[in-house]
Curated annotation (Swiss-Prot):
Pfam families: FliE (PF02049). GO terms for molecular function: cytoskeletal motor activity; structural molecule activity. One of its GO terms (biological process) is bacterial-type flagellum-dependent cell motility. Belongs to the FliE family. It comes from the Bacteria. This is Flagellar hook-basal body complex protein FliE. Signal peptide: none annotated. InterPro entries: FliE. Keywords: Bacterial flagellum. GO terms for cellular component: bacterial-type flagellum basal body. It is found in: Bacterial flagellum basal body.
């Protein structure tokens, strides 16, 4: 049961590492810094991640409601695992947000 949660975290870490490697491999050129090129992929990835987190939370909530209603196909173990996965995804998103805000504050306080 806990193994599936850990594998989810490991897959998320692998995705994050792949994004970091891709960002490090790209050389910044003036054409790469246009707003549409620079923010399009990041914004799309951020929106996709938020959508996945929202879907996981909704699915976990629906499964919890089904368990409360006594649906025989839904076990307590599955409900608890899905709720923990949704919670972990949300906590990860909050940490990413906190780091983005900290980076923004640091950049905005730099003198030109």
């Amino acid at each position: 049961m806990a193994v599936s949660g850990i594998s989810g975290v490991e897959s998320m870490l692998q995705q994050m590492r792949a994004v970091v490697r891709a960002a490090q491999n790209q050389a910044a050129t003036p054409t790469d810094l246009s707003p549409s090129a620079a923010s399009g992929s990041f914004a799309a990835e951020l929106q996709n991640s938020i959508r996945k987190i929202s879907n996981a939370q909704n699915a976990a909530g629906n499964q919890a409601k089904a368990f409360e209603m006594g649906v025989p196909e839904v076990s307590l173990n599955d409900v608890m695992i899905d709720l923990q996965k949704a919670s972990l995804g949300f906590q990860s998103a909050v940490q990413v947000r906190n780091r983005l805000v900290a980076a923004y504050k640091e950049i905005s306080s730099m003198s030109i």
